[in-house]
């Protein structure tokens, strides 16, 4: 697995934070990362900013479909599909289209979450896809994940 110097620095910060505060990274509902205490299983907020924070991954902000595919984090597509379906139903009911806001929100979330997801992938020794493969496969999966919302809007919105 190839990890950039910047990402390795983020992973090292995450590891130091986890060790210092007796925490572990888990995925809630298999979808997004959370921190849990090793002693009492309580949930803690992710450390994303500040001196001990993991920071923001701009590559994950601009290309979440590709980086998540590369590390085999396919829950991204379920997360994306869920929010687009909700946005489609809101569009059907209210006439207001929030799909652009949903896309922007997903990109921001994965910009912050990606260092933790990368940490989990490294910890679990997940085999990675090559960059070109992850871009092509990720685009295909991303399109497939928005098909349900397209169908909902096509069937229920009559212009």
Residue ranges of predicted features:
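Hydrophobic, membrane-inserted alpha-helices
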Residues: 59-65, 80-90
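Transmembrane helix recognition focused on a "late"/terminal membrane span
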Residues: 2-48, 84-159
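Membrane interfacial helix-start motif at the N-side
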Residues: 33-76
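Hydrophobic alpha-helical transmembrane segments
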Residues: 77-78, 101
């Amino acid at each position: 697995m190839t990890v950039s110097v910047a990402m390795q620095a983020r992973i090292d910060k995450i590891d130091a934070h986890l060790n210092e505060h007796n925490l572990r990274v888990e995925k809630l509902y298999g979808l997004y990362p959370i921190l849990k205490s090793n002693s009492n299983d309580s949930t803690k907020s992710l450390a994303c900013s500040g001196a001990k924070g993991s920071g923001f991954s701009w590559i994950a902000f601009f290309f979440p479909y590709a980086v998540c595919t590369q590390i085999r984090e396919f829950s991204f597509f379920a997360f994306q599909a869920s929010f687009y379906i909700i946005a489609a139903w809101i569009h059907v009911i209210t006439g207001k289209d929030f799909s652009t806001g949903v896309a922007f929100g997903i990109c921001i979330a994965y910009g912050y979450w990606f260092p933790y997801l990368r940490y989990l992938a490294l910890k679990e020794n997940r085999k990675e896809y090559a960059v070109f493969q992850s871009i092509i496969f990720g685009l295909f999966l991303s399109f497939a994940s928005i098909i349900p919302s397209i169908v909902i809007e096509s069937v229920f919105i009559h212009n």
